[in-house]
Swiss-Prot record:
The gene is gpmA. GO terms for molecular function: phosphoglycerate mutase activity. It comes from the Bacteria. This is 2,3-bisphosphoglycerate-dependent phosphoglycerate mutase. Homodimer. It comes from Haemophilus influenzae (strain PittGG). It catalyses: (2R)-2-phosphoglycerate = (2R)-3-phosphoglycerate. Pathway: Carbohydrate degradation; glycolysis; pyruvate from D-glyceraldehyde 3-phosphate: step 3/5. The active site is at residues 8, 86. Catalyzes the interconversion of 2-phosphoglycerate and 3-phosphoglycerate.
Amino acid sequence: MELVFIRHGFSEWNAKNLFTGWRDVNLTERGVEEAKAAGKKLLDKGYEFDIAFTSVLTRAIKTCNIVLEESHQLWIPQVKNWRLNERHYGALQGLDKKATAEQYGDEQVHIWRRSYDISPPDLDPQDPNSAHNDRRYANIPFDVVPNAENLKLTLERALPFWEDQIAPAMLSGKRVLVVAHGNSLRALAKHIIGISDAEIMDFEIPTGQPLVLKLDDKLNYVEHYYL
């Protein structure tokens, strides 16, 4: 069986080189075109889906909608869940990546961005931009909503959704599309493929490119490739 991952199209803050994380930003025109191209590619390759999973962030939701529309499948059920959100970049969210490197040093910023288990500084829960002040997370316990994450914590947060929603859907015979974010998809790919803590640092997923994970009937990894 096949599982298709798509990272959202190029966003406004990708274009501005800002740390985004859980901040809710829109797609650029380039991002819209990437999503359209992904949908057309899926249509041309004959990919059909029974259900789509995405995050609760606009850039992923819009990408999912565009992909499904272009592949003539906008009617299928979509499940939106915060566990597929991008990695939370803590107090770095909204900061310019280059300016942050100049302030803290390239090495420190590289550690925050690429270390598997070291998180950036926490975002104050009282900050106006904190997820604690966003009603889309109102039903999540206060101590469960992150203030900063590394990739390890992102995987720990995303894994229950894989186990409770995505994997059961696939095992029941449903054809699944997941449209999410660079780090939430990398985290899930790490689990599915069996990528080591060291190797995952160099495993990248480009925006708007369908990644196909081929699995056996017990969801054991076989191979992966881009369309």
